[in-house]
Design a protein with these regions (language model features):
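Short, small-residue-biased leader/transition segments that mark boundaries at the very start
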Residues: 1-6
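Active-site-adjacent beta->alpha loops and helix N-cap segments on the catalytic face
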Residues: 7-14
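Structured C-terminal cap/extension of enzyme domains
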Residues: 18, 30-135
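Short beta->alpha connector loops
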Residues: 7, 29-30
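Short beta-strand/loop segments at the ligand-binding rim of alpha/beta enzyme cores
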Residues: 15-25
Length: 135
């Protein structure tokens, strides 16, 4: 099996048409739905550690033909992903999981630090999303 980064979504469609055994998974949580629309088969979603139901619903809603609902689910993780600007995405995810009551430990150095501003932003986003019923 071969893994590669594809930045051009049209390439997904072109490649799929050339080789029916070539499957595309989105490695970026914010691109799961766009990849599915171009013929991708799913995603590897780090944010699913925090919002498993939301992330799995993107795929399920797409498969059910409920594109507007899938778009809403895809868009709903944007506020969480915005916290990534404060540190390594894996650090933010692990901190979020810990703040939700699951002590999974820190990332290894040098990716084990999230500044106070990032922790505050994360706490705010987690609360806002919990108030919306996201999980």
């Amino acid at each position: 099996q071969r893994q590669m980064c594809i930045r051009d979504r049209a390439y997904i469609t072109e490649t799929r048409e050339l080789d029916k055994k070539f499957y595309v998974l989105s490695g970026n949580d914010s691109l799961i739905l766009p990849a599915l629309k171009e013929g991708g088969v799913g995603g590897i979603a780090g944010c699913s550690n925090v919002y498993p139901h939301v992330l799995s619903s993107i795929y399920n809603l797409f498969k059910e033909g409920k594109l507007e609902e899938a778009e809403a689910a895809q868009d709903s993780i944007a506020s969480f992903r915005a916290v990534f600007k404060y540190g390594n995405p894996n650090t933010v995810v692990k901190k979020a999981v810990a703040m939700l009551g699951y002590p999974v430990g820190d990332c290894r150095r040098p990716f084990n630090y999230l500044c106070d501003e990032g922790v505050e932003a994360l706490a705010k986003v987690l609360k806002e999303n919990a108030d919306k019923g996201m999980n």
